[in-house]
């Protein structure tokens, strides 16, 4: 299916016909575009630029190298925070599940002996503060993950690098504390 008429491009346009020195995202406007936001299409290839880069919201547009540097740092820190939040949630979950109590009680045994019987009590409730906190943190984590995905989907190379580098740095800084849990019921070690 030929879509070249939709984008005002010739099917004979080759790599030598493209302007590689631009700092703007690839133009994907319809030929009859009046510059309205509805007629703009998302870039479908990676590009390295800092002019007219729209990030998350219509009013949040990067137009200078300084703004791109600031956006890079902000996205990098957001990706780091996301990784830290994942590890922090695991730690909170582990702490909230430590509320397991063992109760021992004497019971009569054979030949008149007394044995100690131990019962395990797990105290988890749906309407508890730890569960509500986990729910709020989960919502925050989901929103941040979608923001990072949408930032990556701008196809701006600088912002994509910021997401990947921030996530990698966050994992490096926070995941070493991650507990290694071995499932004793797993038979494929």
Swiss-Prot record:
**Site features described as Cleavage, chain residue numbers:** 41-42
Q: Does the keyword Disulfide bond apply?
A: yes
Q: Does the keyword Transmembrane apply?
A: yes
| PTM per Swiss-Prot/TrEMBL | Proteolytic cleavage, leading to a truncated form, is facilitated by SLC31A2 and initiated preferentially by CTSL and to a minor extend by CTSB in endolysosomal compartments. A post-CTSL/cathepsin L processing occurs to yield to the fully truncated form.
Known Pfam families for this protein? Ctr
Question: Which keywords does this chain's UniProt record carry?
Answer: Cell membrane, Copper, Copper transport, Disulfide bond, Endosome, Ion transport, Membrane, Oxidation, Phosphoprotein, Transmembrane, Transmembrane helix, Transport
User: Motif Methionine segments (Mets) motif at which residues?
Assistant: 13-18
GO BP term, pick one = copper ion transport
Q: Name one GO cellular component term.
A: apical plasma membrane
Q: Where is the composition biased (Low complexity)?
A: 20-36
Q: Which residues lie on this side of the membrane: Extracellular?
A: 1-67, 153-155
Q: Which residues lie on this side of the membrane: Cytoplasmic?
A: 89-131, 177-189
Q: Which residues carry this modification: Cysteine sulfenic acid (-SOH)?
A: 188
**Cellular compartment(s):** Cell membrane; Early endosome membrane; Recycling endosome membrane; Apical cell membrane
User: Which residues are recorded as modified (Phosphothreonine)?
Assistant: 113
Please list every transmembrane segment annotated in the UniProt record, as residue ranges.
68-88, 132-152, 156-176
Q: Which InterPro entries match?
A: Cop_transporter
In alphabetical order, the GO MF annotations are: copper ion binding; copper ion transmembrane transporter activity; identical protein binding; silver ion transmembrane transporter activity; xenobiotic transmembrane transporter activity
Catalysis: reaction(s)? Ag(+)(out) = Ag(+)(in); Cu(+)(out) = Cu(+)(in)
Q: How does it sit in the membrane?
A: Multi-pass membrane protein
Q: Where is this region: Disordered?
A: 15-36
Q: Which family does it belong to?
A: Belongs to the copper transporter (Ctr) (TC 1.A.56) family. SLC31A subfamily.
Q: What is known about its subunit structure?
A: Homotrimer; is stabilized by cisplatin via interactions between cisplatin and the methionine-rich clusters, and could be crucial for the copper(2+) reduction process and copper(1+) stabilization. Heterotrimer between SLC31A1, CCS and SOD1; this heterotrimer is copper(1+)-mediated and its maintenance is regulated through SOD1 activation. Interacts with KDR; this interaction is induced upon VEGFA stimulation leading to SLC31A1 and KDR subsequent co-internalization to early endosomes, thereby activating KDR downstream signaling in endothelial cells.
Supply the domain comment: The C-terminal domain mediates copper(1+) binding and is involved in the copper(1+)-dependent-ATOX1 interaction. The C-terminal domain appears to act to limit transport through the pore by regulating the rate of exit of copper ions at the intracellular side. The N-terminal domain can collect copper(2+) from copper(2+) carriers in blood. The N-terminal domain, in the trimeric arrangement, tunes its reactivity with copper, promoting copper(2+) reduction and copper(1+) stabilization. The Mets motif is involved in copper(1+) binding.
Q: What is this protein called?
A: High affinity copper uptake protein 1
Species of origin = Sus scrofa
């Amino acid at each position: 299916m030929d879509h070249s008429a939709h984008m005002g491009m010739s099917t004979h346009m080759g790599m030598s016909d493209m302007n590689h020195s631009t700092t703007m995202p690839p133009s994907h406007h319809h030929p009859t575009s009046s510059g309205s936001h509805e007629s703009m299409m998302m870039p479908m290839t990676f590009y390295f630029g800092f002019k007219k880069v729209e990030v998350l919201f219509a009013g949040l547009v990067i137009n200078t190298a300084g703004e791109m540097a600031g956006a890079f740092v902000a996205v990098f820190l957001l990706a780091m925070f996301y990784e830290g939040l994942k590890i922090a949630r695991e730690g909170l979950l582990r702490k909230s599940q430590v509320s397991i109590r063992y109760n021992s009680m004497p019971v009569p045994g054979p030949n008149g002996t007394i044995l100690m019987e131990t019962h395990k009590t797990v105290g988890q409730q749906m309407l508890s503060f730890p569960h509500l906190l986990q729910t709020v943190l989960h919502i925050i984590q989901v929103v941040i993950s979608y923001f990072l995905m949408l930032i990556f989907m701008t196809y701006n190379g600088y912002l994509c690098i910021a997401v990947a580098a921030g996530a990698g740095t966050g994992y490096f800084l926070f995941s070493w504390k991650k507990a290694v849990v071995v499932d004793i019921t797993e038979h494929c070690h």
